């Protein structure tokens, strides 16, 4: 057993209001640069829908993640080394700019410089890649916001598999949920395995997956290999970039920017201890529906004396073990079984987990629109189909989803009896196997969600690292070229990258 630590995240979809604050703050901090205009390390999708980039969950098309061979070994879905190298100069499974969207801005300067005319001057959209005027904006980073567009296009959502999706196109049966997405920082990352340059690595101390910008040669195999499509190609620098889990903040014991600025308090950060030697066998599980439980088996109890002893021997600091014992991620994933992984069938063992949404369910239950199954309402007839959530979070296995939903309903039933009726009613808790102490703690973490409860991040031990003070307020991702550009000779053809076009001051001559 080799014990390692990882900073994981849980997102409570029951409380997400779809405000996109996380996306905007992440964009302003990390991807507001030339070449990354189209990239969103964090985005919030409306489900059902094909998402961003288009149809990212269709692995038959994009070949992301892992597959299990007949002999029980894992192999990237894109192919073995020979097949991967055979596609290195022409990858047919690579998303194009149209699968994301062509980034654009508006020539606002025209509003000030337009000559006098009988028509109101307007700011026309222009491409941030070519600088040319765009006749029509056909896509964007949030094109399906709040079920935008016709159901025929949204029905291509891969999570409708094994469902009669036609009925959900009717207005009476419409449902919606928000899904914030970022890099999963997987335990078994396919992007690391598919990079020909060996530029992607997973940090031992906190599990964050990063791309070495000096080693990256822009082959873009990692974009295909990542089943979540959370790696982006910077057309300015010629290198791939991805969510870095705000590791400078994590090292200082602070939460990520998306977590810090979340309006709904839906994000939780905490340390998980895991057995690194068990990753291969867990990811190689034959039945996809067993992958969720096998990943749970990889995680270790931070309160177990034997685990603590072995962790210290393996170099895990005591402060990290102490943080793991207070981790909200461990409580929600292991103790209460509320948090579930996103598409475990990709076999990457993702480390950003989700609590399934309950809000529309609760309103229907309160109105008496749901049948009752004992004390709790019948969660098999909810507005958001359980099978849809299962396809999204547990490879189609409905039992973990049902347990999570029932436990959240039971906690609400218990607290309502306590605060409204003034009595203790534990019947709902007994039905789902929860104690009163667990229900009270769940209420504190889910409803109150204090800062110190949501974020338990130990500062890193980098006593021997060089002083980073000279880098403060500097320009990142410029490869030593100062703050005036990102030109670099670190590319295949040793050529100068094109400059981005400033479209805000570019105007058309008037007739």
Residue map of PLM features:
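Non-ligating segments of multi-cofactor redox enzymes
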Residues: 1-511
